[in-house]
C-alpha cells in the first residue's frame, strides 16, 4: 500500500507550509491526481486521515480532483483521450504517443488557519 507513504509525504509538505505560515490548523488539502498515476484515491484518503492524526492536518478534508489522461502523438501532434497506459493516435493511428496528462500527483492548494 504505497498510498500510506504518499499520504505521509503530503502531511510532511502540508505541515511544513503551515509552520512557515505560522498556522495552527490545516482545514483542506486539495490534490490533483491523474487517473493513470497508479494511486487508489479512496485508499489515499483513508491513509491521509490516519497519517494526519496528531498533526496540524488532523481532521483536514482531502479534496481530490482526478485528472483524465491525455495522449499526444509524436507523428502528427494530435492530442486525444487515453483509456490505457499504451495508446494509439486517434487521428493517424501511430503508436508513437506520450501521455501528457493524467499521471499527476500534485498538491494544488492548502487551506490553513
From Swiss-Prot:
GO biological process: protein maturation; protein modification process
Database matches in Pfam families: HypA (PF01155)
GO molecular function per UniProt: nickel cation binding; zinc ion binding
Binding site for Zn(2+): 73, 76, 89, 92
Protein keywords: Metal-binding, Nickel, Zinc
Binding-site positions, Ni(2+): 2
Gene3D superfamilies (alphabetical): 3.30.2320.80
Domain of life: Bacteria
InterPro entries found in the cross-reference section: Hydgase_Ni_incorp_HypA/HybF_CS, HypA/HybF
PROSITE patterns membership: HYPA (PS01249)
Annotated function: Involved in the maturation of [NiFe] hydrogenases. Required for nickel insertion into the metal center of the hydrogenase.
Family membership noted in the UniProt record: Belongs to the HypA/HybF family.
PANTHER family, per database record: HYDROGENASE MATURATION FACTOR HYPA
HAMAP family: HypA_HybF
The protein's name: Hydrogenase maturation factor HypA
Species this chain originates from: Chlorobium phaeobacteroides (strain BS1)
